[in-house]
């Protein structure tokens, strides 16, 4: 018997509910009018979908709906299974299968290959218990637990129990849940408004036979989702159609107002059985729905559930049959006493009468058992009624599911949602056609959702055990993560120690004593005061591209014109003479372009290679880096080499005034706009700082008055072992794998070249412990420098949906869950926070030194900053500033981001030098 589903319907068209080929459609006007009520158009389904989605979003926001709505209850289940969960768990299932209670012993092995079937036993709940006092019900449950365990050698071990309680509850924790209202025929007094977990614990204690700890309260819908077999796509929706109906799904926690959280996901139980909207559901309600509702235990409540749930489908069929019989259409108008009795047609009867394999034979048998004498045409019409009622139920269920899928697609901002839906309940088990119609209707209503439906494996048993196991796994993984990241959480005391150590190293370095800080004089003796004027040239050499700049300093403005020139490999690795001749050629070309030929402008040279300065215009190249290896340069004064190249190029006059490193250039660039800027800070690929020191404190330069800019070279701070207590196993791994083990230890804990590597080593460690990526070791994480520091900035800049985290890690070939994404974010935050705090401790040491040098109670000072990590990371600058405020409360520090420190800064160093020279002449 092939069902014609809703595929291909146009707006306003109705889905066919023909039971099977060969069965005549009802021809009488009464039966047609009767069954026409159960037909639903696509437009009506779309209206239900939209209305339910609106109710869901209102409930998530905590807004009251004008009509009875869905509840959207957080279940505090925060993760779906990984497949590695293991252990023994006890499960108590109440309310999932009508008037019965089930106890299970579930063993999870952590592997698909070695699966242990759960042991279970079902207990029938007497009707007087279902309608009696609440304590009586929970005492009955405790007795059933004891009776079940009596059959097994449990001894006196503590047992972990998951409680599957399939009624609307308000959960405030995984093991705290208050019953909102009874459904499914239960009406035990004294339970609504009470914590059912505590009621069960009290009953178990009264029983006193076994030590049982109730650790999780789960409804059958959540258990269905959690009990789903792991497939190729995440199972993040659970759908139950049993005696009642409900759905749950994994929602972004930030959207659940009741949680007040902004990270991760949580499973939300929709409780859609209570959904009702007159505009959406009113047009599809029949007279039979109204009659069923009036006769129910809960008139006016659970209206949506009463159109779908298995507890009601048989009763709807009975009401239709009674109506047709009373009008003489069926059974010659003779209704038996049984047919007139509420509840005589059950879900199983409807399923059997729909079964295509038995034809109408089983219909005859069931009707005869009800005291009826059906003709062949009666059996066919009864079968048609069953199909009409169940088809509508499947279509309404599909409209509700489509609303959930739309919600998921929207909240995840995905063009096409790929998701698995776990299905459970006897309606799915007994009605194969129900699932087919559901699938077809979902495809029609949610065309951009690629959905696979997976039957849940004992959601009430294994699924509830899985919730308990997942909670245990998350708790264990959380402990490991916190232990791993604990060394990165610097205390105020630790930061104060770093500040003091930095201060001590500064003093020793200035006095020429052994120190990890070089404290090199730069021969820059003043910062800009705003009176600088004129045109200056600047050169910027630090890589394969070389810049020549014209910097015009006027009152209140600095204009920059620059030209980029490439340095061919043959020049970078050839003779030094040819390299500097090429540089001069570029300068001459720039002068021609700017109409400066023949002019001798003061020139500042930013030379970003290791140098020892002997004067403002003297710098000895210690060694080439960054792919340069020009011969005859190391150990030579690079300003002299430049001047010699100028001399060789006749008719060119250039006045080389200063050689500058990028840190000093940064300070000077900001100093023009803010005269209080007396410190420069670089936090990029590397890190360094400079500041204006009292000349009397600089042992290597004669003089007792005035200032001197000191290049700290603070990346080497801690090379004497002073940072050993802060160094982690991951820092050690990064250091040992570097090209300079044991060197630049401070830089390796702060700068952009190394933070990504620290994160990579932490991720490897957590993966090896099974905390990340399900413990699956991947080759990509083994590769050095695969995790770029820019990833930290992108990950920590991410929106709350963690899309960037997923994209970055998936591009690296890693398969991750939502939990993995959150943990990677936490790792990045811990590493970058420590880096910023260490940097802040260094800045605090410097500004405190400046304050005490001048004998001030309070100091107001600015710091010029440059570097990609500082500028691009979303939180680094704020963390540095906050740390300085804590460690140097007597200093008011303003951080200024530098603009072109290597160009503008070099020109301003030159401008200040010219100003000082002119003042000296005067």
Curated annotation (Swiss-Prot):
PROSITE patterns from the UniProt entry: HEXOKINASE_1, HEXOKINASE_2
Q: What is its EC number?
A: 2.7.1.1
Instruction: Identify the stretch(es) annotated as Disordered.
Output: 1-23
> What biological-process GO terms show up in the record?
fructose 6-phosphate metabolic process; glucose 6-phosphate metabolic process; glycolytic process; hexose metabolic process; intracellular glucose homeostasis
A GO MF term: D-glucose binding
Q: What class of enzyme is it?
A: transferase
Q: What segment(s) does the record annotate as region Hexokinase small subdomain 2? A: 529-660
User: Where does the chain bind ATP 2?
Assistant: 540-545, 685, 752-753, 789-793, 868-872
Q: Which residues bind ATP 1?
A: 93-100, 436-437
Q: Which reaction does it catalyse?
A: a D-hexose + ATP = a D-hexose 6-phosphate + ADP + H(+); D-fructose + ATP = D-fructose 6-phosphate + ADP + H(+); D-glucose + ATP = D-glucose 6-phosphate + ADP + H(+)
Residues annotated for D-glucose 1 binding in this entry: 166, 183-184, 219-220, 246, 271, 302-305
GO CC, alphabetical:
mitochondrion
Q: Per its Swiss-Prot or TrEMBL record, what regulates the activity?
A: Hexokinase is an allosteric enzyme inhibited by its product D-glucose 6-phosphate.
User: Which residues of this UniProt protein bind D-glucose 2?
Assistant: 608-609, 625-626, 661-662, 687-688, 713, 747
Q: Which UniProt keywords apply?
A: Allosteric enzyme, ATP-binding, Glycolysis, Kinase, Nucleotide-binding, Repeat, Transferase
Under the heading Pfam families, the entry gives: Hexokinase_1, Hexokinase_2
Segments carrying the region annotation (Hexokinase small subdomain 1) are 82-218
Which residues take part in binding D-glucose 6-phosphate 2? 540-544, 662, 685, 866-868, 902
Domain Hexokinase stretches: 25-469, 475-911
Which of this chain's residues are annotated to bind D-glucose 6-phosphate 1?
A: 93-102, 220, 243, 424-426
Q: Where is this region: Hexokinase large subdomain 2?
A: 661-900
**Sequence segments annotated as region (Hexokinase large subdomain 1):** 219-458
Q: What does this protein do?
A: Catalyzes the phosphorylation of hexose, such as D-glucose and D-fructose, to hexose 6-phosphate (D-glucose 6-phosphate and D-fructose 6-phosphate, respectively). Mediates the initial step of glycolysis by catalyzing phosphorylation of D-glucose to D-glucose 6-phosphate.
Q: What is known of its domains?
A: The N- and C-terminal halves of this hexokinase contain a hexokinase domain. The catalytic activity is associated with the C-terminus while regulatory function is associated with the N-terminus.
Under what name is this protein listed? Hexokinase-3
Q: Which organism is it from?
A: Mus musculus (Mouse)
From which lineage does this chain's organism come? Eukaryota, Metazoa, Chordata, Craniata, Vertebrata
């Amino acid at each position: 018997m092939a069902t014609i589903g809703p595929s291909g319907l146009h707006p306003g068209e109705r889905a066919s509910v023909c039971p099977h080929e060969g069965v005549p459609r009802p021809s009488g006007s009464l039966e047609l009018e009767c069954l026409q009520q159960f037909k639903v158009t696509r437009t009506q389904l779309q209206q239900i979908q939209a209305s339910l989605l609106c109710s869901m979003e209102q409930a998530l926001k905590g807004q009251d709906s004008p009509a009875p709505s869905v509840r959207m209850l957080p279940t505090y289940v925060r993760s779906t299974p990984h497949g590695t969960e293991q252990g023994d768990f006890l499960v108590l299932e109440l309310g999932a299968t009508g008037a019965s209670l089930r106890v299970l012993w579930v063993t999870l092995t952590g592997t698909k290959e070695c699966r242990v079937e759960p042991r279970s036993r079902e207990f029938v709940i007497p009707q007087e218990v279902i309608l009696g006092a609440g304590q009586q019900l929970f005492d009955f449950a405790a007795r059933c637990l004891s009776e079940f365990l009596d059959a097994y050698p449990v001894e006196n071990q503590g047992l972990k129990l998951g409680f599957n309680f399939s009624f609307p509850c308000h959960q405030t924790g995984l093991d705290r849940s208050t019953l909102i209202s009874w459904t499914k025929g239960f009406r035990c007094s004294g339970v609504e408004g009470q914590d059912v977990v505590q009621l069960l614990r009290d009953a178990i204690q009264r029983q006193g036979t076994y030590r049982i700890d109730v650790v999780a309260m789960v409804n059958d819908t959540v258990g269905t989702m959690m009990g789903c077999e792991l497939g190729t796509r995440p199972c993040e929706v659970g759908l139950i159609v049993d005696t009642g109906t409900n759905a749950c799904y994994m929602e972004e926690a930030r959207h659940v107002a009741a949680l007040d959280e902004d990270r991760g996901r949580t499973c939300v139980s929709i409780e859609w059985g209570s959904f009702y909207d007159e505009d959406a559901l009113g047009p599809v309600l029949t007279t039979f729905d109204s009659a069923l509702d009036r006769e129910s235990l809960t008139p006016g409540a659970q209206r949506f559930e009463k159109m779908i749930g298995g507890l009601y489908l048989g009763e709807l069929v009975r009401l239709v049959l009674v109506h047709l019989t009373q009008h003489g259409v069926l059974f010659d108008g003779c209704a038996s006493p049984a047919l007139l009795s509420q509840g005589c047609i059950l879900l199983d009867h409807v399923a059997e009468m729909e079964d295509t394999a038995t034809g109408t034979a089983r219909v005859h048998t069931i009707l005869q058992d009800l005291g009826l004498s059906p003709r062949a045409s009666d059996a066919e019409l009864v079968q048609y009624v069953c199909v009409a009622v169940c088809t509508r139920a499947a279509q309404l269920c599909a409209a509700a599911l489509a609303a959930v899928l739309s919600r998921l697609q929207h909240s995840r901002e995905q063009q096409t949602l790929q998701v698995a839906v776990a299905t459970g309940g006897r309606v799915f088990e007994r009605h194969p056609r129900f699932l087919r119609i559901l699938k077809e209707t979902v495809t029609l209503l949610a065309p951009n959702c690629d959905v696979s439906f997976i039957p849940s494996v004992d959601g009430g048993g294994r699924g509830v055990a899985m919730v308990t196991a997942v909670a245990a796994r998350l708790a264990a993984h959380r402990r490991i993560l916190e232990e791993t990241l604990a060394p990165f959480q610097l205390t105020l005391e630790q930061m104060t120690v770093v500040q003091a150590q930095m201060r001590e190293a500064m003093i020793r370095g200035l006095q020429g004593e052994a120190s990890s800080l070089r404290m090199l004089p730069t021969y820059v003796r003043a910062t800009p005061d705003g009176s600088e004027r004129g045109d200056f040239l600047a050169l910027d050499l630090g890589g394969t591209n070389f810049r020549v700049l014209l910097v015009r300093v006027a009152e209140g403005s600095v204009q920059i014109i620059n030209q980029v020139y490439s340095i061919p490999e043959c020049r970078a690795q050839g003779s030094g003479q040819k390299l500097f001749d090429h540089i001069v050629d570029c300068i001459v070309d720039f002068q021609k372009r700017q109409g400066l030929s023949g002019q001798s402008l003061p020139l500042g040279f930013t030379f970003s290679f290791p140098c020892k300065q002997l004067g403002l215009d003297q710098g000895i190249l210690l060694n080439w880096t960054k792919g340069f290896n020009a011969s005859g340069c190391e150990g030579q004064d690079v300003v002299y080499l430049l001047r010699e190249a100028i001399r060789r190029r006749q008719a060119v006059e250039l006045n080389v005034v200063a050689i500058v490193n990028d840190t000093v250039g940064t300070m000077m660039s900001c100093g023009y706009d803010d005269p209080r800027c007396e410190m420069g800070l670089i936090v990029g690929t590397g890190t360094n700082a400079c500041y204006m020191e009292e000349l009397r404190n600089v042992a290597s330069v004669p003089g007792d008055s005035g200032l001197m800019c000191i290049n700290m070279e603070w990346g080497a701070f801690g090379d004497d072992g002073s940072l050993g207590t802060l160094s982690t196993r991951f820092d050690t791994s990064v250091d040992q794998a570097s090209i300079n083990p044991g060197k630049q230890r401070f830089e390796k804990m702060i700068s952009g070249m190394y933070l990504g590597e620290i994160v990579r080593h932490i991720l490897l460690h957590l993966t090896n412990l099974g905390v990340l990526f399900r413990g699956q070791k991947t080759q990509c994480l083994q590769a050095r420098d695969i995790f770029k520091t820019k990833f930290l900035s992108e990950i920590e800049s991410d929106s709350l949906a963690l899309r960037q985290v997923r994209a970055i890690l998936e591009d690296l070939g890693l398969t991750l869950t939502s939990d993995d994404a959150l943990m990677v974010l936490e790792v990045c935050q811990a590493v970058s926070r420590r880096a910023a705090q260490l940097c802040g401790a260094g800045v605090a040491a410097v500004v405190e030194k400046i304050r005490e040098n001048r004998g001030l109670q309070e100091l107001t000072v600015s710091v010029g900053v440059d570097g990609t990590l500082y500028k691009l990371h979303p939180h680094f600058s704020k963390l540095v500033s906050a740390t300085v405020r804590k460690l140097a409360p007597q200093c008011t520090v303003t951080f200024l981001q530098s603009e072109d420190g290597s160009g503008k800064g070099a020109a301003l160093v030159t401008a200040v030098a010219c100003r000082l020279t002119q003042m000296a002449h005067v």
